[in-house]
Amino acid sequence: GFDVHIFCPEADAPASRAARKTWVADYLDAGALRDFASSCDVITLEFENIPVEASDVIAACQVPLHPGPKSLAISQDRAEEKAFLNGIGIPTAPYEVIAAASDIQAALERVGGTGILKTRRDGYDGKGQAWVRAPGEAEGAWSAIGEAPAILEAAIPFECEISVIVARSSNGQTLSWAPPRNVHE
């Protein structure tokens, strides 16, 4: 069997019930991260909203960390993620990087006239998103996402959205699970 340790800033994290030990500290507490890493044979991340600096500290401890800091950094920024995917030949919906509300109108024309404004960071399950169907909606959409750096993604026809989870072993073997369908209200 495995002895599972978790590291999180909350003392009452749900995973604590199944863990042998819960390390409670801020994600940027380098000393606590090093102590945690020294107690582990391998470390994995539950989600992508952990500071990259935390993964850098763990990686420096020479404990296998999956995903590593580079993958974590890419997954935290929608523009970086799309550029990476396009760069390795995986197509995405057309998009434009948005730094200010004044960028939206020209970007809207380039993506076909209708799009979804999405924060570059910290967005999930519809959080940090606003539709832009006409140039007059740009300011409202920008305000709705908190005036955060964003991408404007073209509205494209699709049948459904799925999430694909793939695991890869250290020797390169991959395994995937049946993809669940995502339904957003």
Task: Please provide the spans of the model-predicted regions.
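Active-site nucleotide/adenylate-binding loops and adjacent lid/helix of ATP-dependent enzymes
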Residues: 74-163, 167-185
